[in-house]
Regions:
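Cyclophilin-like peptidyl-prolyl cis-trans isomerases
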Residues: 22-185
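Bacterial N-terminal signal peptides
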Residues: 10-20
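Bacterial N-terminal signal peptides that target proteins for export
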Residues: 1-12
Length: 185
């Protein structure tokens, strides 16, 4: 009888541990950690809104593509933009551009959007922006694919650019690293 009870306890413990790890993994799914000089920004991605855009940023994060990339365009009251390896706003990753995944989900303070050429809705690649305030004029015109869930005060600290130069930043702040939750590299 004692042997059966002990086996039953082991079996229950095994299933409970498995459930705990599954829950922890589910909470990390589609979560990004963006580290800046001021601390960590946590972003929850939204594959329900834009699966291809989420897939792209996760792929690039796994490749450490964003490490050291600057916030090249930051406009006070509008957004902070990064993701161009040249820091000019004219480049992207080695992958093909993405087709737009527009939705009616509003761009609010903390929303994560994919930057693109304003004249080509299907030109998103690796550049993204974080809204510093609500931006209703972007709704249905840009791909909204996530939101800042902690660290928005750190986004507010990112060095701003000149409004007269469309947000171009002199000596811009950098992304120290951008990782998927659970990636400890």
């Amino acid at each position: 009888m004692k042997k059966t009870s002990y086996s039953l306890i082991k079996l229950i413990a095994f299933f409970l541990c498995g459930s705990f790890f599954s829950i922890a993994h589910a909470e990390d799914a589609h979560t990004l950690y963006l580290d800046t000089k001021d601390g960590r920004i946590t972003i929850q991605l939204r594959p329900d809104l834009a699966p291809k855009h989420v897939e792209r940023i996760e792929k690039l994060a796994k490749e450490h593509f964003y490490d050291g990339i600057v916030f090249h365009r930051v406009i006070d009251g509008f957004m902070a933009q990064a993701g161009d390896p040249t820091g000019t706003g004219l480049s992207g990753s080695r992958y093909l551009d993405l087709k737009a995944e527009f939705t009616d989900t509003p761009f609010k303070r903390g929303s994560l959007g994919m930057a693109r050429d304003p004249s080509d809705k299907d030109s998103a690649n690796s550049q993204f922006f974080i809204c510093l305030a609500d931006q209703p004029q972007l709704n249905g015109k840009y791909t909204n694919f996530g939101e800042v869930v902690s660290g928005m005060e750190l986004v507010d600290k990112i060095k701003k650019g000149s409004k007269s130069e469309n947000g171009k930043v002199t000596d811009p702040d950098k992304i120290i690293k951008l990782r998927l939750a659970g990636d400890n590299s």
